[in-house]
Amino acid sequence: MRITSEQAAAIRQEVTRLAGDAARVWLFGSRVRDDARGGDVDLMVELDEAVPEPAQLAARLSAQASRAMWGRKVDVLIKAPNLQTLPIHSIAMTEGIRL
């Protein structure tokens, strides 16, 4: 995994602050592969309750996670009961690492 434990903790803290204690966060994409270089940070936040404004939540989470990653670009997917589940959500859960 190509983020530090401090960065992972900061991301978890921001996800909890913005999405609640029950939120689960997954790191996926190139950052889970130690042999990869560069790349943005891909996160999926999984929630048990409906999200009324998922785009706003994703944008807030992305901005806060980017700060924790020293300005690195962070893409955030939201998985919630009221949102369509896409193949990328399954990829994030099967190939990703839960933070």
Task: Give the residues covered by each predicted segment.
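Catalytic core of pol beta-like nucleotidyltransferases
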Residues: M1-R24, V32-G38, D48-L99
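Short, aliphatic-rich beta-strand segments
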Residues: D42-E46
